[in-house]
Amino acid sequence: MVEQNLEKLQTDLVETEQRLAAIIDSFIELGVYVYDFPGTEDSMQGMVTNMQRNVDRMKQLNQQANDPESQLQNFLVPLDVLQYIEDGRNPDVYTREFVEAIRRSNQYQRAKIHGLNKLRDSLAEKIIDELPELQPHVESIIARTSPQRTDPISPSIVDKP
């Protein structure tokens, strides 16, 4: 079911992309017509025909987007991406910047976690050195705060005299 919906979404997206490309090409063509407009009856009729074709294509695109059977209603585009496009920027740049920002954030968080783990281990070592009777409690705390560890406490802390 999910795979079928995903396939339908992919089909709808490809169809929408093709329709948008046709509309954009037609508007570019219309812009050339307007720029080179000779003022003849035939050229005016060609421009009107091209404009009518664009209106029809946009109407079809709108109908497809509002079709209850279409998977496009489940496809949400972030407003930031739309703003990028509206500003004349490439949405791929947004994607690249977003991925880089997430990567930097992940590196920062990873460094914080690593630093806190080192602090925890250092504190545990000092507590065990000074108060050996608390070693079971310290090991318990380390075991609960280190889900990736299989041993409750690092050997360097336990092996201290």
From Swiss-Prot:
One of its GO terms (biological process) is regulation of transcription by RNA polymerase II. Pfam families: Med10 (PF09748). One of its GO terms (molecular function) is transcription coregulator activity. GO terms for cellular component: mediator complex. InterPro entries: Mediator_Med10. It comes from the Eukaryota. Keywords: Activator, Nucleus, Transcription, Transcription regulation. Transmembrane segments: none annotated. It is found in: Nucleus. Component of the Mediator complex. Belongs to the Mediator complex subunit 10 family. Component of the Mediator complex, a coactivator involved in the regulated transcription of nearly all RNA polymerase II-dependent genes. Mediator functions as a bridge to convey information from gene-specific regulatory proteins to the basal RNA polymerase II transcription machinery. Mediator is recruited to promoters by direct interactions with regulatory proteins and serves as a scaffold for the assembly of a functional preinitiation complex with RNA polymerase II and the general transcription factors. This is Mediator of RNA polymerase II transcription subunit 10. The lineage of its organism: Eukaryota, Fungi, Dikarya, Ascomycota, Saccharomycotina. The gene is NUT2.
